[in-house]
Amino acid sequence: MADSSSFPGTNPFLKVSTKDDKYSPIQKISEEEEYEVTSPTDPTFRSAHSGATAPTAGNSFNGDNGSNEGGEGIQFNRPFDAGFGQGSEGQGEHVEPPGGARPTAAANQGFPNNYALGRRTSVSAESLNPTSAGSDSWTPPCHPKTEEQLSRLKTAVSNNFLFSHLDDDQFRTVLDALVEKPIPAKDIKVISQGDAGDYFYIVENGHFDVYINPAGSVQPGPDGIGNKVSTIGPGGSFGELALMYNAPRAATIVSADPKSTLWALDRITFRRILMDSAFQRRRMYEAFLEEVPLLSSLKPYERAKIADALDAIKYPAGSTIIEEGAPGDAFYLLESGEAEAFKKDVEGPVKSYRRGDFFGELALLDDKPRAASVVAKTDVKVARLGRDGFKRLLGPVEDIMRRAEYSAKPSPS
């Protein structure tokens, strides 16, 4: 199997020269080798049934870029050469799928060639139940990286919201599973709207344009990818929706710079780590919120909503969590460690906090500046709830929080 035509590889996006290179600079990276699936109720069924039975352009496997063994072959197509009568996937040399010829039952039974007689799309290949995490023998992939690669990767993912809630072990697992994917040219199509998705991508450098066709998939012709709606730059990511919801790709992504770098995370690792960690995090916070006296009067579904809105933040000993006089933008629950409140012109701490205590509420209730500073006495972990979530979710306990204003002298918020 040629390394240049299979995932994973050192540079899977190598350009493949063909006779019609001069007509379109846009190439396509095909993530899937499975056949297209057409339902008998689809409007195109009748026309497909009455048409020729020869393989369509959209079903070609590799063109002339080599073997497709291993299930992750790469296909560079030119989708917009309408003058050559090509469909949305381009016309290349047709290569039969691995394992022998395609089934012939379709022709015998009157079904179109691309009806579901091949394998199902792999986007539905596994069912992941968060409650069964750890009950099977799944082992996350580990791709060795140099220190230089790790440094670049950490910088690329440091501000990505999808990784913000992971603990240190989960974060390391994700870093190990990511694979570097250099993009050597402009106008390379990384994913296509309507396709099944196998990877989630993080942008290390370069920019990628996002196109959406109202039809829901790439169409034939020079404008088949639709309208440009946005651009994704360094630190951004794309491809998560198709993996999270087992849905087709929602947009087409095309490289906008002559040289770019992506990091790719496969579907199973994405779902095992990111989605399961979100489920475990919710269960952990629901259990924690049950221990918070302030929230004991809430119903379970109300605590579940709060759990989904919380962000975990760690502070080392001696660091300031909130500062007196600053505008209030969040409410805090102390998850672990100890903290103390201080006021200007008052010697020593005015209040101490331990697991389950809360602070920062008064500035949000009354739209006033912070009345005190809260400093971490030890290494602490807090659950932060932003202003909007506070107003929306903590209405039922507002009276309790206001009573706390008078029961604690002076107030630490």
From Swiss-Prot:
CDD domains: CAP_ED (cd00038). This is cAMP-dependent protein kinase regulatory subunit. Tetramer, composed of 2 regulatory (R) and 2 catalytic (C) subunits. In the presence of cAMP it dissociates into 2 active monomeric C subunits and an R dimer. Disulfide bonds: none annotated. The modification Phosphoserine is found at residue 122. Residues 1-145 are annotated as: Disordered. Belongs to the cAMP-dependent kinase regulatory chain family. It holds the Pfam family cNMP_binding. SMART domains: cNMP. GO terms for molecular function: cAMP binding; cAMP-dependent protein kinase inhibitor activity; protein kinase A catalytic subunit binding. 3',5'-cyclic AMP 1 binds at residues 162-291. It comes from the Eukaryota. Residues 121-138 have a biased composition (Polar residues). Residues 24-161 are annotated as: Dimerization and phosphorylation. Residues 58-67 have a biased composition (Low complexity). One of its GO terms (cellular component) is cAMP-dependent protein kinase complex. Keywords: cAMP, cAMP-binding, Nucleotide-binding, Phosphoprotein, Repeat. The keyword Nucleotide-binding applies. InterPro entries: cAMP-dep_PK_reg_su-like (IPR050503), cAMP_dep_PK_reg_su (IPR012198), cNMP-bd_CS (IPR018488), cNMP-bd_dom (IPR000595), cNMP-bd_dom_sf (IPR018490), RmlC-like_jellyroll (IPR014710).
